[in-house]
Amino acid sequence: MTRARRQAEARGRWAEWLAMAWLVAKGYRLLDHRARTAAGEIDLVARRGEYLVFIEVKARATRAEALDSIGPRQRGRITRAASIWRAPRSSLHHLHLRYDLVLVVPGRWPQHRRAAWVPGDSARDLL
């Protein structure tokens, strides 16, 4: 692994830790972190009330860069991974699903975007 890749990995881990702390402080219960599935990895899985939330964390120099870094293909991959993760957990099947985004930018509080995308809704862009 190159030095640049190691640094990016370390920034990503730090951003995920910060996002976890932020979400727990807001009342979310963390269920999984860096959840690996056959379709790919989910940064965070949490529950709040009647919602099962799959959360992508993006750390970039600016909020615009963070928003631009998650495209339709990645949203589709996360949605597929979420279905795989949830399938064997029948105790969670009654919960509403939501796909959130946490943007981590240097010198700013994390920005939590609830319901950042809706699977299968091509008319609705990333909020």
UniProtKB/Swiss-Prot annotation:
Residue ranges that the Swiss-Prot or TrEMBL entry lists as coiled coil: none
Superkingdom in the source lineage: Bacteria
SUPFAM superfamilies: Restriction endonuclease-like
InterPro entries: Restrct_endonuc-II-like (IPR011335), tRNA_endonuc-like_dom_sf (IPR011856), UPF0102_YraN-like (IPR003509)
A Pfam family that the UniProt record links to this protein: UPF0102
GO MF entries: nucleic acid binding
Stated family: Belongs to the UPF0102 family.
Protein's UniProt name: UPF0102 protein Mmar10_3014
Gene source species: Maricaulis maris (strain MCS10)
